[in-house]
Amino acid sequence: MLRLMRQQKKETYYLWIALFLLLLYVSPLFILKEDAHIRVHDNLDSNIAWYKVLADSGEIVGKVDAAIPQIINGLPRDAFGTEWSGIVWLHAFFSSMTAYAISQTVTRVVAFFGMYVLLKKHIIPEPKAAFIRIGVSLAFALTPFWPSGMLSTLGYPLALWAFLNIRKGDISWREWLTLGLLPLYSSFVLGFFFFLAGMACFWLYDAITKRRWNLMFLGSIAFMTSIYLFVEYRLVYSMLFEHAPMHRIEFISSRHDVWHSLRLSIKNFVYGHNHVMTVHTVVILPILMVVFAALLFKRNRTKPENVYLFLCVLNYGLSLWYAFWFNKIWAVPKQKFAFLAEFNFARFHFLRPLVIYVSFALALYLIWRMGKGWKWLVYAAVAAQLMVLAPFNEEYTYGVHYNAPTFREFYASEQFKEIKEYIGRPQDSYRVASIGLHPSIAQYNGFYTLDTYNNLYPLSYKYEFRKIIEKELEKNSRLKQYFDEWGSRCYLFVDELGKRYDFKKNSKKTINNLQLNTDVFKKMGGRYIFSSVPIMNAEQNHLALVKTFDHKDSAWRIYLYETR
């Protein structure tokens, strides 16, 4: 009993240290506030501006057929997701940076405790293995996840804990509350659809091998799914009722041959994916491979060892599925069935962070059980993984490694306030577009834009907007394919700039041969163009440079052009 109490005390001590390190990790967001560096891709260039536009529009709880006039002359309200998502209300009640900091903290804390209770209850319950449970949980919580995903992947361990409890018949209000609340801070289509599909397969496996239905387990899966369908009622409505075709129906993603797909599967297996970064290559992967090789031909394997081998196979299987979703074999089915083109089923690989870190914990536990002479390796592996993850803190990654703008410098609110005041007209009375800049910057500052980055907008608008940039696309096959076969970035693409939208004020870049159809631009309501680089042949495009704007708190020099 005394030994058990000492173990519990040590575990509590480890927990407090881990929580301190976790809060230290997110502290720059609260200390630096708008002077913090955070992710640009699929974050500053999109989601953060979306939340602000939605909050400012007054359409958070708008009708299913409502539109947001600030973007592309009426972006469907459904493009911004559901009002039942907690992150929407964080951005409605707090400033953007404060909401972001809170969201990061909530997500990482829930991820930590979710993985911890999963490992303690179902994977590594042995009291003496507390260091493994807590160390791996902390590492999982520090992974550089996609910010607007919230708990879409980092919530998997907590959900799995609840489902495994229900599967065993160990049921309380906690499990049902967990399954009921997670849909309010995660995405169905960007995460939990794939997890719930996995749970359904797990239930089916039980039903076949154990010959029992386990209706409570099945009911819990149905319960969480029904909550998601309620939360995502806008998505359900759009699927059930006719509406104008959206640009996603023209997605073309299946281009790879078999060898390309195999190479991509290995790349994904070894390095992971940008939206679900696991940072497992240097420390975790070698350990997983060595333990896998040691167990593969072992006789009389234990249950934890068999579970470990299954997870390793599943790990590569998910990478293989991801890679082959872009293979040519899917080209015809995607053409015949629109939902296969519109919905990215490759995202089953979003399960990999859960699989990798549970596998890591199991591998360390199997090593730890080999005796005292091996425990040093366990401590070293956890410490090494935490050290590998430390530089992936956003402040270091984007501030030092990428030298990206701070939040304040990116959105440049004071500079764009000067532009708004200089124009001197109500912002809803004219439309703007940007060159060499993300449209989210203008959107964040209240301007009505003809360009945008959204994952859902009318196909007819894409066709109309394309007329503006048609000649530029013809000059650049990569940009043409990028816009025509994907098109979520509905930008004023310029051949000479390529896919760069971040020319800072110290850039020497110029545009010498711009060819825009400004007649179509004006017909759509366009009046001004914000460019981060000078356009040397502006007059040939019926554009006149009105003024250049600089500001000490901005990363950009804005050349304001007006149509003539």
From Swiss-Prot:
<feature type="transmembrane region" description="Helical">
    <location>
        <begin position="213"/>
        <end position="233"/>
    </location>
</feature>
<protein>
    <recommendedName>
        <fullName>Uncharacterized membrane protein YkoS</fullName>
    </recommendedName>
</protein>
<feature type="transmembrane region" description="Helical">
    <location>
        <begin position="97"/>
        <end position="119"/>
    </location>
</feature>
<feature type="transmembrane region" description="Helical">
    <location>
        <begin position="188"/>
        <end position="208"/>
    </location>
</feature>
<keyword id="KW-1003">Cell membrane</keyword>
<feature type="transmembrane region" description="Helical">
    <location>
        <begin position="306"/>
        <end position="326"/>
    </location>
</feature>
<feature type="transmembrane region" description="Helical">
    <location>
        <begin position="277"/>
        <end position="297"/>
    </location>
</feature>
<dbReference type="InterPro" id="IPR046107">
    <property type="entry name" value="DUF6044"/>
</dbReference>
<keyword id="KW-0812">Transmembrane</keyword>
<keyword id="KW-0472">Membrane</keyword>
<dbReference type="Pfam" id="PF19510">
    <property type="entry name" value="DUF6044"/>
</dbReference>
<feature type="transmembrane region" description="Helical">
    <location>
        <begin position="139"/>
        <end position="161"/>
    </location>
</feature>
<dbReference type="GO" id="GO:0005886">
    <property type="term" value="C:plasma membrane"/>
</dbReference>
<feature type="transmembrane region" description="Helical">
    <location>
        <begin position="348"/>
        <end position="368"/>
    </location>
</feature>
<keyword id="KW-1133">Transmembrane helix</keyword>
<feature type="transmembrane region" description="Helical">
    <location>
        <begin position="12"/>
        <end position="32"/>
    </location>
</feature>
